[in-house]
């Protein structure tokens, strides 16, 4: 007789999921516009802004495993309070900093930003401490919230518990990205500053909820030590099979990260300030939500490698759609062709993700040494660490070369001449995704042959 899934969850579970929604709204509201903020508000060039944003996201994938070890020692409640305090200070700092820069006479904010010395001033690097606070706070959130879901659910409701958790993640991400457009429309570039205040308000609300409502089972003293985690990292780096797999999947995520690295600046520069890159980005989770069940059902009798390979070959198609917009002239369904084809490309990216993401952890665990899968899975997101750094830096270089910042040119005509081949950016990502797809096929055949010889 099958046991019915339960809807009864402890209070800590509900509180954790609620504050996860607030945190995701804060993060994605800022992150979808982070390269715009760093360039239009703080004065960084495309390459500098991309490098900072890339390292920012990379560390948010790398540090949580270590933060989780500390959270296990001090307890989840203290960890969450520390996390939301750090996040509120970090987001608030990114909101307040422009006020100090403007009062120092380095810049004037409004619909359009007028730089009066900030670009050449070291004062712009004052944004880095605020971003470090967000990295530290976000690292605790990732480990503690998932830990709470795991520990506050039982066999009878765990599947439903994780379903609720991922729903909250997506609702938060969707709502955070949605707020960007009305702020930009109402305030122009100055709206990018108020996104930080929105994020600070969300995380401060999370802090209040944790302080007054969060009380979980005692978890302090549990979990792995920092030494055990470092040992696992060293062993992964020495495991040739896992490193090759991570590098191959890094290619996929390098392309996927362009939704945050390249897309906002590319669309606004080519389609105009009326474009809505933050709303276009929401097409990705929408497509994932609508198709992941169908794709999972279709691929249920196929191997993880087969499913991942299908997704890898969809990625170059998405990049080609993104490139095609700059070669079309007429509007499509009332949208600028660059914007319309970008939406189509993002939709294909989301579809590709449904073939890859659900099966990667399964395949990764199969490549791990027997009996040590759990320890190795703690670093299964190393591909996102690498792809954030390489993908964002590559974005900055390509934007500067093919679709430079219009404010660097005296006339719109001069900029248009420099950006004639802006769509070439996406051809590079077509190449990366194709190489990754072919490499995954070769990897699968080689690994299969090695396993057959050893059996």
Tell me what each language-model feature is.
Residues 44-58, 125, 160-163, 268-289, ...:
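Loop-to-transmembrane helix entry
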């Amino acid at each position: 007789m099958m046991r019915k899934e339960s809807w009864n969850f402890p209070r800590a579970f509900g509180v954790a999921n609620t504050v996860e929604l607030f945190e995701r709204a804060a993060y994605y509201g800022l992150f979808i516009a982070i390269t715009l903020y760093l360039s239009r508000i703080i004065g960084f060039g495309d390459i500098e802004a991309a490098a900072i944003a890339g390292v920012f996201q990379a560390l948010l994938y790398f540090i949580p495993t270590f933060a989780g070890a500390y959270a296990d020692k001090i307890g989840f409640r203290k960890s969450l309070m520390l996390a939301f305090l750090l996040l509120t200070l970090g987001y608030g700092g990114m909101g307040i900093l422009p006020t100090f820069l403007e009062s120092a006479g380095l810049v004037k904010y409004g619909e359009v930003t007028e730089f009066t010395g900030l670009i050449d001033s070291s004062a712009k690097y004052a944004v880095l401490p605020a971003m470090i606070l967000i990295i530290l706070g976000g690292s605790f959130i990732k480990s503690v919230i998932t830990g709470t879901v795991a520990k506050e659910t039982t066999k009878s409701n765990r599947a439903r518990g994780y379903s609720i958790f991922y729903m909250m993640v997506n609702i938060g991400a969707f709502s955070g990205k949605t707020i960007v457009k009305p702020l930009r429309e109402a305030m122009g570039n100055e709206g990018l500053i108020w996104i930080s205040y929105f994020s600070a308000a969300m995380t401060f609300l999370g802090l209040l909820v944790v302080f007054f409502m969060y009380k979980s089972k005692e978890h302090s003293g549990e979990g792995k030590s920092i030494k055990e985690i470092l040992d696992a990292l060293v062993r992964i780096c020495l495991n040739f099979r896992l490193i090759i797999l991570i590098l191959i999947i890094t290619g996929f995520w390098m392309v996927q990260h362009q939704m945050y690295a390249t897309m906002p600046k590319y669309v606004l520069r080519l389609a105009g300030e009326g474009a809505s890159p933050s709303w276009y980005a929401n097409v990705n989770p929408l497509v994932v939500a609508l198709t992941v069940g169908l794709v999972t059902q279709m691929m249920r009798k196929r191997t993880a490698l087969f499913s991942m390979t299908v997704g890898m070959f969809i990625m170059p198609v998405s990049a080609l759609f993104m490139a095609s917009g700059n070669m079309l002239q007429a509007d499509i369904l009332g949208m600028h062709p660059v914007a319309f084809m970008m939406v189509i490309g993002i939709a294909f990216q989301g579809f590709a993700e449904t073939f890859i993401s659900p099966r990667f952890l399964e395949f990764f665990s199969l490549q791990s040494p027997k009996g040590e899968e759990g320890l190795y899975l703690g670093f299964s997101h190393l591909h996102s660490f690498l792809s954030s750094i390489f993908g964002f830096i590559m974005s900055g270089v390509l934007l500067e070369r093919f679709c430079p910042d219009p404010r660097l040119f005296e006339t719109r005509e001069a900029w248009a001449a420099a950006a004639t081949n802006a769509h070439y950016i996406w051809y590079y990502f077509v190449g990366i995704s194709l190489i990754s797809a072919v490499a995954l096929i070769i990897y699968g055949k080689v690994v299969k042959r090695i396993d057959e010889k050893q059996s």
